[in-house]
């Protein structure tokens, strides 16, 4: 029941509004008629998003910037939603631009107790897909963390939620306001960064509450250090992320304290185009964010996955950017940076820089053999 109610984005918004959790301004119900669509768009204003009620994970979303685009985009979104999710209901949300994507990890026992285990920063995205995550967020202080906690716990309590779950929010840093985006009623890909900074085994907790464990109220959960996770994907980041397939050769997985690589990589593995491109997760922990960034760069520099292209060089390059090291980014930053790189790709200086990163990665890999 909880999975179904949160999987239906229209119903999820209604539940959160009833629990006084802030939601993005938009329509309360799916749009059924063109005149209803036009009126709603006028009330909300452009730019806006058409969102599939049954969508999620960055799927079933279309941006609209004008009246001329509106009706055709609505029809396409409904058609695609029906094909992808078996549900053609579509609603409208205001497009929140230049915001951070911050999510709150919770665990509920279904018996009145909900734990908040800190936040994760997930703003570095491409095509609504996360690339790098971290905990805690460089944008969240203790006062803001308390606000996220109250919203996440209130939302989960309204469901009498049992299990591990994630409340996702968009945070407008300049206004100091955040809005509920969606709830994932499962463990996220990025859950290890929360485990590393809290010392809590989320998989174990999920099994415990499923077995009937009653959680104590208001536990003293502290955040220690900083953790980063980079998604290693079978894509070529220097050719517009074209999928890369083939056999993995010359695999070398480095080992170091506070570093790990989660995945099923093995020598000779055949990477096909039929599945999600993510191959592994490079995860590190350190006492502070600067050290964690250096540790992630080192881990990626010593990781070798031959035979195919991967996003590893992108991760190394990200760890060297001033804006990343300063924690100064939002959900548009990565795509803007990538676009700037594409436009400057013919610059010999830029090409030399990319070649140097790839060469350094290859050298580090060969030295680790």
Predicted regions and their residues:
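N-terminal beta-alpha lobe that positions the nucleotide/phosphoryl donor
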Residues: 1-167, 171-188
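Catalytic cores of soluble metabolic enzymes centered on carboxylation/carboxyl-transfer
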Residues: 192-369
